[in-house]
Amino acid sequence: MPKPPDYSELSDSLTLAVGTGRFSGPLHRAWRMMNFRQRMGWIGVGLYLLASAAAFYYVFEISETYNRLALEHIQQHPEEPLEGTTWTHSLKAQLLSLPFWVWTVIFLVPYLQMFLFLYSCTRADPKTVGYCIIPICLAVICNRHQAFVKASNQISRLQLIDT
């Protein structure tokens, strides 16, 4: 019968805490069972969420320039356009006056589409990758509807034989 190791020394306790270099546990087993596409999908989801958190932090905490421009725009009274105004200034004024829900839709729909695509890459079945993207989803739904109509037309053409 093998003798249990004595972890009284520092290096042995470090080996106990860190391990022998091989990971074990349910997370490691789940990672080993995934194929390459699924692993890259999970890494992509993690990096996408990390980049999203950094972008949200930048927009809402660090970017003083946008806050200053938005406050200046709110404090201004509507004036007649000046003769020296360029098209970029007028475009910026029009974009800053858009309501919050428009900006939310403009940024949230592509953001969610990209997230759902990366999340679909984590699925085990490669045929289901990308079904959550709106154009692909609409194409699949229309294709299924056309197949259903075609099948129902073929069934209605069959004659019942009374015996």
Curated annotation (Swiss-Prot):
Biological process annotations from GO: lysosomal transport; lysosome organization; regulation of vesicle-mediated transport
GO CC terms of this entry: Golgi apparatus; Golgi cisterna; Golgi membrane
Membrane topology type: Multi-pass membrane protein
Keywords: Disease variant, Dwarfism, Golgi apparatus, Host-virus interaction, Membrane, Transmembrane, Transmembrane helix
Parts of the chain that traverse the membrane: 40-60, 98-118
Coiled-coil regions listed: none
Cellular compartment(s): Golgi apparatus membrane
Main location: Golgi
Pathological condition linked to this protein in its record: Dysostosis multiplex, Ain-Naz type: An autosomal recessive, severe skeletal disease characterized by features of dysostosis multiplex, severe short stature, coarse facies with broad nose and prominent lips, protruding abdomens, and progressive skeletal changes causing gradual mobility loss. Death in childhood or early adulthood may occur.
Biological function: Required for mannose-6-phosphate-dependent trafficking of lysosomal enzymes. LYSET bridges GlcNAc-1-phosphate transferase (GNPTAB), to the membrane-bound transcription factor site-1 protease (MBTPS1), thus allowing proteolytic activation of the GNPTAB. GNPTAB is involved in the regulation of M6P-dependent Golgi-to-lysosome trafficking of lysosomal enzymes. LYSET is thus an essential factor for maturation and delivery of lysosomal hydrolases. (Microbial infection) Essential for infection by muliple viruses, including SARS-CoV-2, that utilize activated cathepsins for entry after M6P-dependent lysosomal transport.
UniProt family annotation: Belongs to the LYSET family.
UniProt subunit comment: Interacts with GNPTAB; this interaction is important for proper localization of GNPTAB in Golgi stacks. Interacts with MBTPS1.
Protein name: Lysosomal enzyme trafficking factor
The species this protein was found in: Homo sapiens (Human)
Gene: LYSET
